[in-house]
Amino acid sequence: MLTMKDIVREGNPVLREVAKPVPVPLSDEDKQTAKRMLEFLINSQNPEIAEKYSLRPGVGLAAPQIGLSKQMIAVHTTDENEKEYSLVLFNPKIISESVEMTHLEGGEGCLSVDREVQGIVPRHARITVKAINENNEEVRLKLKGFPAIVFQHEIDHLNGIMFYDRIEGWVDPYKREINPSL
């Protein structure tokens, strides 16, 4: 079972890497890892389990957040109509996005970020994601609202992007300036 000790925190270089594609057909090891990621999210939303194991509630988790530079995400959330999204995806790509933008009123948070970050994170209101599911099948998901925001946040992790990188005027304290004169 994954716990908060397994979640890498900001400043860890793996969070800034572009994750590697997962070979298909999927290995049993990759399927198990993804299953454990989803299990973490489900457990984190259960008040008794979350309290017992000191889990912070989460709706999405990307493999880089557990130290693996692989294109794998898990999501466990619902939309405004209570439709549940509880799944793992491999090699997810956003293949279309709306011009219309949206954001979460209170800003975004992240299991890998132990502090509150103020600011609005602009996201596309609607997206289509293409990916491989745990049965090695290609799937396409049309998403809007909160699930669209969650999937964009997790797919950003696969590209080395933290949510606060998208806040206008944000300066990353962990980003190193490269001195061209050296």
From Swiss-Prot:
InterPro entries: Peptide_deformylase (IPR023635), Peptide_deformylase_sf (IPR036821). It is an enzyme of class 3 (hydrolase). Fe cation binds at residues 110, 153, 157. GO terms for biological process: co-translational protein modification; translation. The active site is at 154. Keywords: Hydrolase, Iron, Metal-binding, Protein biosynthesis. It holds the Pfam family Pep_deformylase. It comes from the Bacteria. Binds 1 Fe(2+) ion. Its EC number is 3.5.1.88. It catalyses: N-terminal N-formyl-L-methionyl-[peptide] + H2O = N-terminal L-methionyl-[peptide] + formate. Belongs to the polypeptide deformylase family. Removes the formyl group from the N-terminal Met of newly synthesized proteins. Requires at least a dipeptide for an efficient rate of reaction. N-terminal L-methionine is a prerequisite for activity but the enzyme has broad specificity at other positions. This is Peptide deformylase. It comes from Halalkalibacterium halodurans (strain ATCC BAA-125 / DSM 18197 / FERM 7344 / JCM 9153 / C-125) (Bacillus halodurans). The lineage of its organism: Bacteria, Bacillati, Bacillota, Bacilli, Bacillales.
